UniProtKB/Swiss-Prot annotation:
Keywords: Copper, Electron transport, Magnesium, Membrane, Metal-binding, Mitochondrion, Mitochondrion inner membrane, Respiratory chain, Translocase, Transmembrane, Transmembrane helix, Transport. This is Cytochrome c oxidase subunit 2. GO terms for biological process: ATP synthesis coupled electron transport. It is a multi-pass membrane protein. It comes from Petromyzon marinus. The chain crosses the membrane at residues 15-45, 60-87. Mg(2+) binds at E198. Residues 1-14, 88-229 are mitochondrial intermembrane. GO terms for cellular component: mitochondrial inner membrane; respiratory chain complex IV.
Amino acid sequence: MAQQAQLGLQDAASPIMEELIHFHDHTLTVVFLISVLIFYLIIVMVTTTFMNKHSLDSQEVEIVWTVMPAIVLITIALPSLRILYLTDEISNPHLTIKAVGHQWYWSYEYTDYHQMEFDSYMIPTNELEPGGIRLLDVDHRIVVPMESPVRMLITSEDVIHSWTIPSLGTKVDAVPGRLNQATFITTRPGLFFGQCSEICGANHSFMPIALEAVPLSNFENWTTKVLAS
């Protein structure tokens, strides 16, 4: 989860987020090198007074400043396209969860189980237990088995919302009348928080998401307990 005064990205908890972090670092390196080059050229232009009236045009220079930006764009675009297709790749999910956005809470349905559904509301600050996370903890968390492909089906009952968990690299719009999907695999156990990332009304800031990744045996015990209740 995010830390106070954090400037970087959250620690990755899924393969997709690891890819996104690597792509971020790759792109930042390219942009930094371009910025250094441009800054150097600006300094040279400002501090020198060299003039050459005979250098009116240069075919070689025009080729270079056309080809080089194209190469730079390709080095950025290819990894981006690869990750784009990876985020849309869904095959043989072990678990499917349907998330429905409401003003201003989420409801979840485990479609592989009979009548296993619940609403998830933010816990008010005055009701938080010691150790609870203000504005992020909820009364009913999503629980998923770690190291298993999970498919999320996401929609909305009223206005546009966005189901987002940064540590998993997942952000999907919840649109009324439309069923969007996403997939993720949690690579480690833990508690991961997110929030609605689409302004959806007065209490937009108060519809968090809490997902708990646990070993498969713990997940089976949890489902048995939920179904029994």
